[in-house]
Amino acid sequence: MLDPSSSEEEAEEVVEEPEIKEGQAPTTGTRLSPSRTSESSGGLQPSSRSSSVRPSSPSPSVVSEKEKEELEKLQKEEEERKRKLQLYVFVMRCIAYPFNAKQPTDMARRQQKISKQQLQTVKDRFQAFFNGETQIVADEAFMNAVQSYYEVFLKSDRVARMVQSGGCSANDSREVFKKHIEKRVRSLPEIDGLSKETVLSSWIAKFDAIYRGEEDPRKQQARMTASAASELILSKEQLYEMFQQILGIKKFEHQLLYNACQLDNLDEQAAQIRRELDGRLQMADQIARERKFPKFVSKEMENMYIEELKSSVNLLMANLESMPVSKGGSEFKLQKLKRSHNTSIIDMGEENENQLSKSDVVLSFSLEVVIMEVQGLKSLAPNRIVYCTMEVEGGQKLQTDQAEASKPMWGTQGDFSTTHALPAVKVKLFTESTGVLALEDKELGRVVLHPTPNSPKQSEWHKMTVSKNCPDHDLKIKLAVRMDKPQNMKHCGYLWVIGKNVWKRWKKRFFVLVQVSQYTFAMCSYREKKAEPQELLQLDGYTVDYTDPQPGLEGGRSFFNAVKEGDTVIFASDDEQDRILWVQAMYRATGQSHKPVPPTQVQKLNAKGGNIPQLDAPISQFYADRAQKHGMDEFISSNPCNFDHATLFEMVQRLTLDHRLNDSYSCLGWFSPGQVFVLDEYCARYGVRGCHRHLCYLGDLLERAENGSMVDPTLLHYSFAFCASHVHGNRPDGIGTVTVEEKERFEEIKERLRLLLENQITHFRYCFPFGRPEGALKATLSLLERVLMKDIVTPVPQEDVKNVIRKCLEQAALVNYTRLSEYAKIEENQKDAENVGRLITPAKKLEDTIRLAELVIEVLQQNEEHHAEAFAWWSDLMVEHAETFLSLFAVDMDAALEVQPPDSWESFPLFQLINDFLRSDYNLCNGKFHKHLQDLFAPLVVRYVDLMESSIAQSIHRGFERESWEPVKSLTSNLPNVNLPNVNLPKVPVTLPVNLPQMPSFSAPSWMAAIYDSDNGSATSEDLFWKLDALQTFIRDLHWPEEEFGKHLEQRLKLMASDMIESCVKRTRIAFEVKLQKTSRSTDFRVPQSICTMFNVMVDAKAQSTKLCSMEMGQEHQYHSKIDELIEETVKEMITLLVAKFVTILEGVLSKLSRYDEGTLFSSFLSFTKPGMDLADAYVTFIRHSQDVLRDKVNEEIYIERLFDQWYTSSMNVVCTWLTDRMDLQLHIYQLKTLIRIVKKTYRDFRLQGVLDSTLNSKTYDTVRNRLTVEEATASVSEGGGLQGITMKDSDEEDEEDD
């Protein structure tokens, strides 16, 4: 607190000096000090203060309208300033001495709000993170999550609007990010040893690090701690400072008012309250007498109103009475008196009931006696021991330490307690007796003091009364006696007094003004060494004032009196200052409304140089003079009962709310604890009605909310519920009277509130972006339900609430879609800034619609994520809202689709995007919009499948006509250059007059790589399988929502695949037979690559039919089983045809051997030649080559095994038949050697190819083997040369030799 004479206050005083009431001469109202008179000419006066001096009036013709307006404006500003100063006086008194309210400690702590600059800083920090300019390590998943949060939340215009409204805190940002990542983290795959909670915590920690940036967390924590403390409890000085800012009060103005109001004097503040309460009671009586009531809703409420006024004052009196008189507790609160509610002068007749006795006002004093030193000890030897004793009469005796007579110094303190208002303190000086027979020490001198609480506290020299036998007659002792003033003793001192009933003789007595309780004071006169007062006067009902000297009364210089009906007591003090202090103290005690003005002040005002305070005036008078000099006395001395506190409170509450909404907290309209405390105290002390307070608060909050500020609906709910309860007679604060103004204003507020709430629900995405503030939307819906109630008891029918919310959400759909469309256009314009003026093609329109669909889905997802919980009671309305929202999008979507060329397939991604979202939403799946979407695209899908079927059928026909049957891999060694089928463009025959149907992009089938990594089928078959799989994958990826049509599509595609594969298999079978017919019948035959390719086509057809032709339903496997059977039959036929070809070649060899049959003409000729083994070797080579090619090129092992089994069996059957036909003939040696070679090599080669022993060692083979063995034996006997090492015996050596 500034010192009144400080340089700062004086410096400001120069600027603020000319505060002169209108029409008052400067020299009379404001007297400057001599040193400043030269500055008062007005040259240095600021314009804001010069308005208080009325300028000279020019003629009407000269004064312009503008000047008049300017003058009126200045006058209004001056009136406003005065009103604020007066209001500040009332607020200061509430802060200085609260007796009704306390600063609440249970209020929710508000978060620091984010400003525009801070939001931009946060964005920059996130951008730095993306650019890699931070040290934060992050994986791709976290980067994606942060990028999404940055794009969706931080860059959102709704967040910028929330920041502008003052409702966005750092905690909101953190909570939104937490919610944003929870789904992402939950969807991540499990990692051993790493829980999802750990990942969440890590991500949040990294987010905090990004959000905080390079700022030292310790500094931030310290700042947060300090701000949190200021948000909780404020000191009186902080409260003064805050309301100076709220009301625009300058520091020096506060200092003047603070000192002049004596706010640091609790007695003065309590007295002020007593005077105010007395005034309110008198005002209540005046209203009752004059019948000047407010207009109530019922005439019967007028008498109730008076009772409520008196009851409220009684409550305040009780609160004041409960305030402790002393800080120590109840020691001096002797009794609670049964006072009536009225302390005014009028009803003091029953005072005997409250009469004090002398025992009620016993005081307790603490004394400190400090003995410093003694002077004048000359007769004692320097080494003699001296000491002092001290006592308060009637109490214990204390002694100092011993000291030598040469240095009699102690500094010893003794503490005493006494009930005597005029105690006797005795201090004695002793020396130790040296005599042998001395029984006690010798007293040298003594001093007896009678201190009072007003006595000097510092050490003083006192002359001692010397003992008779002490030679030193000039003994002096330096000591200090400090007598503390009890809390319940308000003033004391000597006064001359005379009264009618007490103190009947004019005499000087020692008086103490004692406060027994907050409402009971007594003037007590005491004698020395007495605990109880000799006489006392209870001050209830008395009025104190200054008076002139009374003739005939000798003694006393300055007179004053205490007057009561039938009694007058005259007092006189020895000086003017003491009189002023006594009058002030008694003025506080009596509770009178009249404020005594000392005669010296009136004289001083008229005296020259009167601004210099008199030497005998108290400091409080000095402050009052200074306040008067600055024009503040009117605010200090004004009677609070004469003001319309309802209007003043409305003003201070509005200004406090403005201040609160502009501070650094995201308060949402909630006052700080300190502000609540001051407003509570003001309402209680000055009788502001609770309903009026809440109506004003609601009005102010609604005004701020309507202008874009974020206001907590729970706060609105509290105030609205209070007002509703009051207006409907429920007495929430015990007040039963309801004024017409309150009722009318409540209805007006109710309607405004209803419109605001409906508007907020309509704009819920923008008023509560991302579900922030938490729970606000839910509270808004709850409040709307309360507002719609006709009274406070009958709940509103749910259907009525539902209809209101339905209407709001219908409008919300339009608002949301309109803003979304505008945003999409802005985004599009920014993207295409360089292509301004280009034509909007159907493709561009479709592209824009797809982008708009993405935004629509994003909005619906955000609604579900952030707002669905609030609408839990009305979830069906949210579904209706979503359908309405989508129906608006449907208009734009339909328009974009209408302009697309016929048979264009570019719109399928739009269907997939929307359908994938809708089918995952339980409420929207197969809803109105979803069915509309299906109706739009079903014909397109059918048309697409028709064209694909036709295209694929024709590609099969043409492909097989031109088919080379070369395997795909052997077409070229460079796979990327292979002319693979175009996934996105299954070719349609040129003869069809349609656009080429292009499939939307999708992932390649899983079997694609496997096909092209091996020597598989032909180009035509691979193209077929690719297209069939691509088509089925595409249709499957559509995820058609309607089950029946989906089954129909699947069934049709499976049937199509079955037909196509069947056609492929049959065409391959025909080509296979044709190919075989064209090949050689001799041992020169080599299995061509095309034969293997055809087999592989069968292999692929079998593999693909499992996927392309099988259905997961019951009837079902008919397509798959049918095509499987066809493939199996075809493969059997192909194997049979190929084996027949091999048998034909073997028969050709045997035909050649037949020429050597015994008895033929040809054999007789050939008997003279010696043919070699060329024929056998050629056949063996043919077998081996064919086996190797088939084994290497055909991919199905089962087919190879079946082929080799059948081939071997057929070969042996042919040989056996040939030998059986020659059963009666002996084989020619050439025949024998050739057959042995063929049979042995065939057996060996097929065994190496894996033919089973059971097949190899068949009866046919045994028959052939036995015959050849017999023939071999016969030939070895008959032929001299033998078989040249060729034998049927198993011999590895022979085999190796033959090889």
From Swiss-Prot:
Q: Which InterPro entries match?
A: C2_dom, CAPS, MUN_dom, Munc13_1, PH-like_dom_sf, PH_domain
Composition bias (Low complexity) maps to 38-63
Residue ranges of coiled coil: none
Q: Which UniProt keywords apply?
A: Calcium, Cytoplasmic vesicle, Exocytosis, Lipid-binding, Membrane, Metal-binding, Protein transport, Synapse, Transport
Q: How does it sit in the membrane?
A: Peripheral membrane protein
Set out the biological process GO terms recorded for this chain's protein. Answer: dense core granule exocytosis; exocytosis; positive regulation of exocytosis; protein transport; synaptic vesicle exocytosis
Example GO molecular function: lipid binding
Keyword Calcium on entry? yes
According to the UniProt record, one GO cellular component term is: neuronal dense core vesicle membrane
**Protein transport: is it a keyword of this entry?**
yes
Q: How does it assemble?
A: Homodimer.
Describe the function of this protein: Calcium-binding protein involved in exocytosis of vesicles filled with neurotransmitters and neuropeptides. Probably acts upstream of fusion in the biogenesis or maintenance of mature secretory vesicles. Regulates catecholamine loading of DCVs. May specifically mediate the Ca(2+)-dependent exocytosis of large dense-core vesicles (DCVs).
Q: What is this protein called?
A: Calcium-dependent secretion activator 1
Q: Which organism is it from?
A: Xenopus laevis (African clawed frog)
Q: What is the lineage of its organism?
A: Eukaryota, Metazoa, Chordata, Craniata, Vertebrata
* Gene that this sequence comes from: cadps
